[in-house]
């Protein structure tokens, strides 16, 4: 079973609120999850300490079992001071390179 650490949207229309959850990769975005490991409120100021709240010990446990964070959640985890496994860091770098290559290719095609 592939497990991901990702965001699940909540809140009302135009007032998003996200839970950071550990879920099966094939489960729907807002569907069943294994564990809630934090919250993210994008409506708060970026310097507010309540904007991103994470359970560091549980995230470390899930990363140790092989759960893969999404790009946004990986940024939150790094900002919280949790070290990501080298494999995850390399995968993120490769994705970033591929994204840049696609964008430059698209821009060249449009020009």
UniProtKB/Swiss-Prot annotation:
GO CC, alphabetical: cytoplasm; small ribosomal subunit
GO biological process, one term: translation
NCBIfam families: S16
UniProt name for this protein: Small ribosomal subunit protein bS16
UniProt xrefs under SUPFAM superfamilies: Ribosomal protein S16 (SSF54565)
Keywords: Ribonucleoprotein, Ribosomal protein
Gene that this polypeptide is encoded by: rpsP
GO molecular function: structural constituent of ribosome
InterPro entries named among the record's database cross-references: Ribosomal_bS16, Ribosomal_bS16_CS, Ribosomal_bS16_dom_sf
């Amino acid at each position: 079973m592939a497990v991901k650490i990702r965001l699940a949207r909540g809140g009302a229309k135009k007032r998003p609120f996200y839970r950071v959850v550990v879920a099966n990769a094939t489960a729907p975005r807002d569907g069943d999850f294994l564990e809630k490991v934090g919250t993210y409120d994008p409506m708060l100021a970026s310097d507010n300490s309540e904007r991103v709240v994470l359970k560091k010990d549980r995230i470390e446990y899930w990363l140790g079992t092989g759960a893969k964070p999404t790009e946004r959640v990986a940024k939150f985890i790094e900002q919280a001071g949790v070290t990501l496994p080298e494999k995850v860091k390399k995968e993120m770098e490769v994705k970033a390179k591929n994204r840049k290559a696609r964008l430059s290719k698209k821009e060249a095609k449009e020009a």
